[in-house]
From Swiss-Prot:
Protein name from the UniProt record: Elongation factor G 1
Residue intervals of the tr-type G domain: 8-291
Keywords, ordered alphabetically: Cytoplasm, Elongation factor, GTP-binding, Nucleotide-binding, Protein biosynthesis
Stored Pfam families: EFG_C (PF00679), EFG_III (PF14492), EFG_IV (PF03764), GTP_EFTU (PF00009), GTP_EFTU_D2 (PF03144)
Subcellular location, principal: cytoplasm
Species name: Burkholderia pseudomallei (strain 1710b)
Length: 704
């Protein structure tokens, strides 16, 4: 079956933003204007099409990124039909993992900013993730009708805070309640949207007299940015500033956007139906198609480098980037096709797990509505039914031409809670529910505490775990009670311990056990665990060296201070001995474990705690209360700035997670409910000795 839309007319984009910047409303408008969704879903009344989990509708935040396909022929109907696959991404910091995994499969992103709040903490996180995956982006400054709206301030913030080069291709006509439309700096015309038709109709008009000078000033900056795309254009521009044609400007801006050198910037009010269609045109004009993106890299089963180009003629390759449980069809695996073609019924290789599976039905999603399709091709995003083995980050490919694409990395959880079902009868059901949810979300973990037998759930923040417990009740009918949140401490060492030996000897008639290992242990900040084999002269036979490493790895799970996982240590295996008859893998595993425990005791072990980046927005009158409260929580204030439009102060601080439980309640009472805050995990830092002692004692009492 031939391709309906040429790959050059595909756009795989994400819409990402800080919570409350109006991202879901923007996505809803896109679905409306592209004719997919006939009634605009409003977040205010809990009817948004994209926010399809019940909790999202209640909380008014987007949790799971749903993938949606829409078609667009341009605002004025002057483009050939383009296919836009939109991945909706959450803006709450507890769901950063969702943003991370969608960035991995996108070709371009539209960053939505609040015209008043501007660049907020989550905007910085999302920007970093887009940089990491080299995702070209455009910026849409939303809510231009709000009091305090300031398009140009957001433009400056993108430069100052995000180090991005934002190039306005529009400027607003009016602001706050006088916001009417935009000036298109490429065409040098004003665009005014008609309220009666919900913005479907619009007119091009002359630029209002009071904006002509400003429009010329910003057009000049835009054309200059475009001219830097090539020597020829620059020369042409320097000869005559007005010599670049509309097509030349667009092509040059596109080239520089795809190279991640600039970020074209637009504005509007999605809620007031202004500016969204022009943003869709910009998606087509400036963001890449799958064909504009470099070939994706991976390696074959022999670890040789391999690549796949975005073409139907290449062998099939795809990445599973999300798993969801659907009440009607069971497990859905969302995947992005990088190359080749696959039909329902074909056999695929899951190269990551080296298992073959038959592809059942293929569904294309529109939020939570679905359409069954026969095949998918390079550049498509779809959902598969019937893949039992696939999990997030797995590569699916042609069994005859295997490739493993680069895996996704997921952060370690920072908070955990004990959880138990309200009725004993639900124990098994709870286990199944938690395992299913952990399969869907790689940043959520479930384990059993070996000492207490309790089920422990871990995640990226309090809201993350709240929603897991909530989903367990709604989707699986299991009500659970949760314990107090516990901080995920870590242990590491401060100094070097050399020549530490571990000897495991059991010789009591018959075959004995003998393992002897000597190690050096040193700090390895920020690099995790490393094991170096420095054995010379065969004092430990080759086949037993992995056993020493295994023994140490098992011991890393529980440190010597308080039984927390050990991180950032480097172990050198330097010496040892063996017995011809009695040595075996188990003996060397035990020797490695004993040596490591002893070395850790000697190397000044310390406790590490997660530090959170906290930002508080508060009216100025309560500034003292907020600062005092943060200091009492061992917080270090790192900066303050005015919120534009007389909106109070923004305080940035770094605070230990252990001190942040219950913060929202105390912030409310300290500021009469007028302050808001966000926090996200920053890094691990050494715990002060008095806190460390308290944590260790509490752990020992718990064990005792």
């Amino acid at each position: 079956m031939p391709r309906k839309t040429p790959i050059e007319r595909y756009r795989n984009i994400g819409i990402s933003a800080h919570i409350d910047a109006g991202k879901t409303t923007t996505t809803e408008r896109i679905l409306f204007y592209t004719g997919v969704s006939h009634k605009i879903g409003e977040v205010h009344d809990g009817a948004a099409t994209m926010d399809w989990m019940e909790q999202e509708q209640e909380r008014g935040i987007t949790i799971t990124s749903a993938a949606t396909t829409a078609f667009w022929k341009g605002m004025a109907g002057n483009y050939p039909e383009h296919r836009i696959n939109i991945i909706d991404t959450p803006g709450h910091v507890d769901f950063t993992i969702e943003v991370e995994r969608s960035m991995r499969v996108l070709d371009g992103a539209c960053m939505v900013y609040d015209s008043v709040g501007g660049v907020q903490p989550q905007s910085e996180t999302v920007w970093r993730q887009a940089n990491k995956y080299k995702v070209p982006r455009i910026a849409f400054v939303n809510k231009m009708d709000r009091v305090g709206a300031d398009f140009f301030r957001v433009q400056r913030q993108i430069g100052e805070r995000l180090k991005g080069v934002a190039v306005p291709i529009q400027i607003p006509v009016g602001a706050e309640e006088h916001f009417q439309g935009v000036v298109d700096l490429v065409k040098m015309k004003a665009i005014v949207w008609d309220d009666e038709s919900q913005g479907v109709k619009f007119t091009y008009e002359d630029i209002p007299a009071n904006l002509v000078e400003l429009a010329h000033e910003w057009r000049e900056k835009m054309v200059e940015a475009a001219a830097e795309a090539s020597e020829e254009l620059l020369e042409k521009y320097l000869t005559d500033h007005n010599s670049l044609t509309e097509d030349e400007i667009k092509a040059a801006l596109r080239k520089r956007t795809i190279a991640n050198e600039i970020v074209p910037m637009l504005c509007g009010s999605a809620f007031k139906n202004k500016g969204v269609q022009a943003m869709l045109d910009a998606v087509i004009d400036y963001l890449p198609s799958p064909a504009d993106v470099p070939a994706i890299l991976g390696h074959d089963l022999d670890d040789k480098e391999a690549e796949r180009h975005p073409s139907d003629d290449e062998p099939f390759s795809a990445l599973a980037f999300k798993i969801m449980t659907d009440p009607f069809v069971g497990q859905l695996i969302f995947f992005r096709v990088y190359s080749g073609v696959v039909e329902s019924g074909d056999t695929l290789l899951n190269a990551t797990k080296d298992k073959k599976e038959r592809l059942g039905r293929i569904l294309q999603m529109h939020a939570n509505e679905r359409k069954e399709i026969k095949e998918v091709r390079a550049g498509d995003i779809a959902a598969a039914v019937g893949l039992k083995e696939a999990t997030t980050g797995d590569t699916l490919c042609d069994p005859g031409k295997p490739i493993i694409l680069e895996k996704m990395e997921f952060p370690e959880p920072v908070i955990s809670q004990a959880v138990e079902p309200k009725t004993k009868a639900d124990q098994e059901k709870m286990g199944l529910a938690l395992n299913r949810l952990a399969q869907e979300d790689p940043s959520f973990r479930v384990q059993t505490d070996e000492e207490s037998g309790q089920t422990i759930i871990s995640g990226m923040g309090e809201l993350h775990l709240e929603i897991i417990v909530d989903r367990m009740k709604r989707e699986f009918g299991v009500e659970a009670t949760v314990g107090k949140p516990q901080v995920a401490y870590r242990e590491t060492v401060r100094t070097v311990a050399e020549d530490v030996e571990g000897k495991f000897v059991k010789q009591s008639g018959g075959r004995g056990q003998y393992g002897h290992a000597v190690i050096k242990l040193e700090p390895n900040p920020g690099k995790g665990y490393e094991f170096l084999d420095e054995i010379k002269g065969g004092v430990i036979p080759r086949e037993f060296i992995p056993a020493v490493n295994k023994g140490i790895e098992e011991t890393l799970k529980s440190g010597v201070l308080a039984g927390y996982p050990v991180v950032d240590v480097k172990v050198h295996l330097t010496f040892g001995s063996y017995h011809d008859v009695d040595s075996n893998e188990n003996a060397f595993r035990m020797a490695g474990s004993m040596a490591f425990k002893e070395a850790m005791r000697r190397a000044k072990p310390v406790l590490l705690e997660p530090m959170m980046a906290v930002e508080v927005e508060t009216p100025e009158d309560f500034m003292g209360n907020v600062m005092g409260d943060l200091s009492s929580r061992r917080g270090i204030v790192q900066g303050m700035e005015d919120i534009a439009g007389g909106g109070g102060k923004l305080v940035r601080a770094e605070v230990p997670l252990a001190e942040m439980f219950g913060y929202s309640t105390s912030l409310r009472s300290a500021t009469q409910g007028r302050a808001t805050y966000t926090m996200e995990f920053k890094h691990y830092a050494e715990t002060p000795s008095n806190v460390s002692e308290a944590v260790i004692n509490a752990k020992q009492i718990g064990r005792g």
